[in-house]
Amino acid sequence: MLHSPIPTKADPMIFEAAADRAARAIPPVWPLMSSVAVNPFLGQAGETLAKAGARLARVAGIAITMPRHWYQQKIDTGEISDADLLAALACAPADLRPIDLAALKAAAALNPPRPQALASVADLAARASGVDWPGLLTERLGAWMAGYFDEGQALWAAPRGKSAYGAWRAVATHDLTPEIAGLRGFARHVSEAPETAMAVIARVCTRLDLPVEALETYFHQMLMSLGGWGQYARYKLWQAELAGGSDQTITDLLAIRLIWEEALFLRYGDQIGEAWAHVRVAHAAPVVATPDLMIDAILQDAAERAAQRELARILAGNAPQIHETRPLVQAAFCIDVRSEVFRRALESLNPQIQTLGFAGFFGLAASHRRFASDVAESRFPVLLNPALKSRAGGPYRAEDAEPQRIKARAKRAWGRFKLAAVSSFAFVEATGPIYVGKLLSDALGLPHASAPNDPAPQLDPALDLASRVKAAGAVLRAMSLTTGFARLVLLAGHGANTVNNPHASGLHCGACGGYSGEVNARLLAALLNDPDVRAGLTETGMAIPQDTLFLAALHDTTTDRVTLYADDHPCQTHEADIAQARTWLADAGRLARGERALRLPRAADETSISKRSRDWSETRPEWALAGCKAFIAAPRSRTATKNLEGRAFLHDYDWTQDKSFSTLELILTAPVIVASWISLQYYGSTVAPEAFGGGNKLLHNVTGGIGVVEGNGGLLRAGLPWQSVHDGQNYMHEPLRLSVCLEAPVAAISEVLGRHDGVRALFDNGWLHLFTLNEEGSIAWRYNGGLQWVPIDDTEDAEQRSKLKVAV
């Protein structure tokens, strides 16, 4: 195959375009303080699983499906049936799939070698010299990036004001470590490098004689070799573009990594030239799936079809009888899968308790400042920009916050003193005895963490009445809650209480940007209790009964305890309702804890659950969203009483009330995308923990205040820690792509997909599965790609299956 050499005076756009594509192939990672789940395959959404597998095998040496023995075990136990295998086989391209079921089963019994990435110049230099150049550059770059990206943790703060490339050059020209290891003249090489990152990239590519076709996957490989540091730089680009700007940090990191490649090539080029020529050709070749990768994709599809069969069986069960009487209480929870267990427990206590599911930020994208804080917390999905600003309110004067500010400053100063370059060495000896009491208290798990209880939040600046009415109406319509209001309506955000857990924010509400959801719930409750807003809603045809009280709550997913913010809206007429609600919530918590205890290691019963949240040695305080496999948007009556085992996102939706299908469009473009990020993060952290997992919690050290490394340095580890998906013996997350089930007309769903190419790509390329439910709640149609649908029919034979075209 002929490849296009880079001209001596190449158009800079060639390099810029390739660098930009490589950067967008990297998933972003949010800092620990507000970490959220991210789809690690975000940059491969336009490819099928098999093709993405080929790409990631080339650039990172990872497999993005499970080892074949995992599927073989499911085949042996009958969990994956022959019908599942046949259906998945029929969907695969004929030129790559096994010829028949027997051949597929024979392939499933084999264990092909795991993929190997193409060698970098550093890899080839290591083989030629015996020096671990990949390890050395990882160590040196990791140490520098920890300082450069530091958010206040480093002993010595890195100089500010320079680009990443400029800051690195200032350090690298004085770092003799590479030269001591054998890379003579490295500091001078760096000092003589071009002044801009793009000029560096152009020079290195020319010197390495890279064909134009090789640039994208080679650049992708270089950024993947930086681990979480590259992902954090991608986050900076994401945030900048969300605000309408741009950021060059990830391009700078690419240039830095390429300077190492160039220096090593100049040093060892004579010894590695032939091997490097083969690598160049391999990078320039088109990315295509191999028969082995297609077999893996077929087996993955079959495992998902088996799970979908089980989901269809559960949903086809008898629906509960709908009570026409007014509910005693309604409770709206986040769609988070952890709410499913609690909602089912709560509804079991009284048939007149009704629960609903809605995105946990309750439709209010607020940038919030807590009491006495100058930090603006983005309490909304990371896909959005803030639409509102809020702050902790209450009947206090501005000067009342000053003592809290002084206390916070003193705490920060004390923290800096503990970490300072000089004082840190004497800190333990000088102040250690002061901490004896705290150490004993923490070791015994004595502190009982309380729910956040700032003064009730308020919008600042306040919205005018018309805007408040519009916002309230939009939220209620999106919740499909426009009639049939109970006397007491609870709006329950969720959060988690854990100790000694750098990933604590990952247990909070993803829809709230990695924060707990009480602020959004309290803001909405205040909005819906406003008499003027209610009067305005009545004029629009949405009448809320005068005796309905909205009350915010916070569901602690670690302990299944619920805090009611009753003091926000004192109401003597509802004291009995609130007291009864507290009793029901406490009883539901006990039931939910009992069910969750069955899955948690060393959890004897429901009473042991609370202790886990206060145990600083506990690496698994809760399973969070491990096990998630389905997203269901339908009336609650379709899923009520059906045990979905805490594995389904549940969003209330009544398409008959959605005349323009604007709510359907909102669901497909927001909650479904957030759920897909969560599902695919768990998937990636399970199938490829070396690239997309957070590593071992027992080895974690927080670095820069933004992430964790294993040990004392190296690559930032992004993704979920191993303890979040595995209990030490078995996987607690089953890596399955999310099955999205919508009760809505097929034509309406297709119309929405036709308007949103990015959403459609996720379904067309198989990163998500899509189904419709009928009016009985049973799965009726499967999306077949290309805006085509096929009916679900258990009697479907192999000939009919051969017509299916869903991507694998």
From Swiss-Prot:
Summarize where Zn(2+) binds, as residue positions.
C334, D336, H494, C509
Q: Which UniProt keywords apply?
A: Cell inner membrane, Cell membrane, Membrane, Metal-binding, Transport, Zinc
Its cellular-component GO annotations read: plasma membrane
Q: Which cofactor does it need?
A: Zn(2+)
Q: Name one Pfam family in it.
A: DabA
Domain of life here? Bacteria
Protein's cellular compartments: Cell inner membrane
Where is the major localization of this protein?
Answer: membrane
Q: Which InterPro entries match?
A: DabA (IPR018752)
Q: Where are the transmembrane segments?
A: none
What is the membrane topology noted in the UniProt record heading this document?
A: Peripheral membrane protein
Query: What's a single GO MF annotation on this record?
Result: zinc ion binding
Its annotated function is as follows: Part of an energy-coupled inorganic carbon pump.
Tell me the subunit arrangement.
Forms a complex with DabB.
Q: Which family does it belong to?
A: Belongs to the inorganic carbon transporter (TC 9.A.2) DabA family.
Q: Output the HAMAP family linked to this UniProt entry.
A: DabA
The protein's name: Probable inorganic carbon transporter subunit DabA
Natural source organism: Allorhizobium ampelinum (strain ATCC BAA-846 / DSM 112012 / S4)
Q: Which gene name belongs to this protein?
A: dabA
